[in-house]
Amino acid sequence: MRLLPLLRTVLWAALLGSRLPGCSSLRHPIYWNSSNPRLLRGDAVVELGFNDYLDIFCPHYESPGPPEGPETFALYMVDWSGYEACTAEGANAFQRWNCSMPFAPFSPVRFSEKIQRYTPFPLGFEFLPGETYYYISVPTPESPGRCLRLQVSVCCKESGSSHESAHPVGSPGESGTSGWRGGHAPSPLCLLLLLLLPILRLLRVL
């Protein structure tokens, strides 16, 4: 049938020429420095969906930097007790990244965490739906920085579970931060493609 190649072309064009909102991942940048009051207070929370990315941007300065010196620190994943105490000494704490290049050329150092259930990489981290994960930073001895904290809530909890709304990190006018909430509804284009696939199979039979 002449309609079959045309329909196949339309489907591939839609898949390749579109980001398919609701079917693709989003990136969530967090500028990790002590000018962010929510990271300082420890009430910063972001909600992420699977296949989203958490992008951590380290402090970055033009030479010679601030008079008090540049912020440098190590970032850790910890449990709740480590998060409350802002310490990385617990048995479940481990270092995730190291922000040690405040004068990196061209742009700040960025570390990316992909929210995924399984990872093929030995240094990757595997997340569970409905769980909350805790990040803290510990300043190096020569750094003027302070302990910063972030909670990452992974969508979604099991049906019937209570869910407290999380506060996004950053808002208009808040210094150096931005954040979004996860849990993305499928886009109309994505749903349309899913509906057309059975029709395509039927046309191949005919």
UniProtKB/Swiss-Prot annotation:
Q: Which InterPro entries match?
A: Cupredoxin, Ephrin, Ephrin-A_Ecto, Ephrin_CS, Ephrin_RBD
Position of sequence motif Cell attachment site:
41-43
Q: Where in the cell is it found?
A: Cell membrane
| Assigned keywords, A-Z | Cell membrane, Disulfide bond, Glycoprotein, GPI-anchor, Lipoprotein, Membrane, Signal
Q: One GO MF term, please?
A: ephrin receptor binding
Lipid-modified residues of type GPI-anchor amidated serine are: 175
Xref: Pfam families: Ephrin (PF00812)
Glycosylation: which residues? Answer: 33, 98
Cysteines joined through disulfide linkages: 58-99, 86-147
Protein name per Swiss-Prot or TrEMBL: Ephrin-A4
User: From which organism does this entry originate?
Assistant: Mus musculus
